[in-house]
UniProtKB/Swiss-Prot annotation:
It comes from Cronobacter sakazakii (strain ATCC BAA-894). Keywords: ATP-binding, Ligase, Nucleotide-binding, Purine biosynthesis. Its EC number is 6.3.2.6. It comes from the Bacteria. This is Phosphoribosylaminoimidazole-succinocarboxamide synthase. The gene is purC. It is an enzyme of class 6 (ligase).
Amino acid sequence: MQKQAELYRGKAKTVYSTENPDLLVLEFRNDTSAGDGARIEQFDRKGMVNNKFNYFIMSKLAEAGIPTQMERLLSDTEALVKKLDMVPVECVIRNRAAGSLVKRLGIEEGIELNPPLFDLFLKNDAMHDPMVNESYCETFGWVSQENLARMKELTYKANDVLKKLFDDAGLILVDFKLEFGLFKGEVTLGDEFSPDGARLWDKQTMDKMDKDRFRQSLGGLIEAYEEVARRLGVNLD
């Protein structure tokens, strides 16, 4: 399957068409961004690590019965995926307090949230991805009530699968975001799951093993990503 025209260039990935109208090529670049793209740097191997990491996680979620767009890996940095009609709202699960939640509510970082919080954000960099709710989605027609309920159900299901997966690897799944779209009318998990879009802490040291290392200028970004992948058993060779 050969990539053809560039359809979209995001902050860390590029999407290409293929000869099949139902399939796309997702290319992971070495770019890393913070502040809605205000700060961008390149890190060797990052595209490869995230591509293989994403394939591994999507495979685990598919095994658990969650529909995903993943078809197969094409190269170290490329994957073949289904073409989805993307929903412009992302789903976030928070198992512990971190990031914007701490700033917004003034609560202590790291406290456990039981039950986990479920948030919705409009995907709009210019507006800094504002927080929205089910009522906004219905009023503005971003996604139907039925499909939103399915997105929420699948997000919680993914959380159950991934919390155990990371816990077994000595990691805490603090929070993460998922993006969904429709494939032939079915709600399907799209975009990616990687340390770019999740917070992962070491269970023993509480060290941050995700993109917060870049956001907070902690250093060792790729080393942390590769360590997470190694613990999970992701083959990076």
